[in-house]
Amino acid sequence: MDCLFCKIANGEIPSNKVYEDEKILAFRDIAPQADVHVLVIPKEHVASSANDVNAENCEIVGYIFAKIPEIAKLCGVDSYRIINNCGDKAGQTVKHIHFHVLSGDNLSERLV
């Protein structure tokens, strides 16, 4: 599969890892939109959140949300924004489900 995030998850492409376990990987965004901007991805390929999350793979979304507070703490923050861009018109550029975790003094009303 020619998926950027799959290649990052399996180590073909290096990343600045924040957290990793057997199910997920969290790494710093290469073009951060806030002081803290981390991407959290499942290691298993799930194409997007709108059309491809189903009964067989939906538990990974809950798992990611359960781990985000721990990931945020590792980044030194206790308040943050979680964003999921779903589809081309929403700005999704990598077709592998992922969540942006953002925090910082200059975040205010901005969106990714």
Name these PLM-found stretches:
Residues M1-V112:
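HIT superfamily nucleotide-processing domains
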